[in-house]
Structures are given as C-alpha cells and as structure tokens.
Amino acid sequence: NIKKSLILQGYYFSNVTSSIKTNDNNTVNIIFNIDLGEKSKVSIIEFTGDKFFKDKTLRNIITTEENKFWKFLSGKKYLNQQNLSLDERLLRQFYLNNGYYDVSVNTSTATILDDDSFKLTYNINAGNLFTVNSTKLDLPIDYNPLNFTKVEKLLNKLEGNKYSFNKISKIVKEIDRISLSREFDFINASILEEK
C-alpha cells in the first residue's frame, strides 16, 4: 500500500523495505525504510492514431507537460495517474467540441525511458466528423413559443455546423434558465441525438 501511494504521488522508482525488530517485552517494532528516489518526469508526449490535429495543439489541451529545463517550478511535468485521467477527459471533450462525436481516447501508456523519466502516449481514434443536419424544439401546447426564441436561435445556429457538445450544453442551460425564470415546474430538457 505504501508503494501504491508513492506511485500515485509520482514516485514510480521509489523503494520500500521493511524490517522487524523484536523487543524484550514481547513486542515488535516494524520499521519501513523508504527511498523516494526522484519524482518521475514526462520527457516525451506523443499522440497516435487518427487524431486529425497536430501534436502541438493536443499538448495545449492536456494538463501534463513535457519536462523542459525552463519548467523547473511546474508540477505538471511529473507522471501522475490523476492527471492522466484528466488528460483523457480533456482530449475527449476537445474532440467532441470539434465535431468528432464517436471519438475514443484509449488509455494512455507510459514507457520507461531512463531512471526517472517516461514517454507518454495517448492513442486517439477520432472517428468521423459529424455535422448537425437539423434541429427541432418540441414544446408542450400550453407553452408560449415566444419564451423560447433565444433557444430557437441557438438551435438554428447549430444547423450545418460541426457537432459541439459545449454548444448543446449551452442550449440546455438556456432552457433551464428559462424554466427557472418563468417558473415552469415540469420542463425536462433532453437532447435526442441521431446518427
């Protein structure tokens, strides 16, 4: 458990040993010797697969950074499992917001380069570029459509453009805002996406 905890903090090359010392009063002391070593740094970040974007663009999306001499204060250059999970989510969101509805970002792999550094590889399958063909707002008959003109305009702007999760989320938030301001109790904003 100690080793796992150290790895989560970026000490992949740490060494933990234990020893037991027997005392005169029928008790024992358990002694853990921990050599942290250096924190593991990311020397190279690469992206493979059908990514459709340059590596430089994708590096600007993720939080993990390559170790460079001018980044001596940055904590983002260290290999960290939580950051890797965040990076995968950020890459997925980036692709979803750029029209790649079926994107998959496969688990990143870290390859040991030397005593304290790794090469980090993200495998991306962007899939096809999706555009929005048509949009439609279905309202109950007792709702005034004039209350939803802004939503209609936002929906119309989507048509013919690349699919964007952020833009769709903004529309749902606008519907929620209208329902709160107009005190509509039973609005259920849902998006039906068809391929």
Show where each model-derived region lies.
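Periplasmic polypeptide-binding modules associated with outer-membrane biogenesis and secretion
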Residues: 1-195
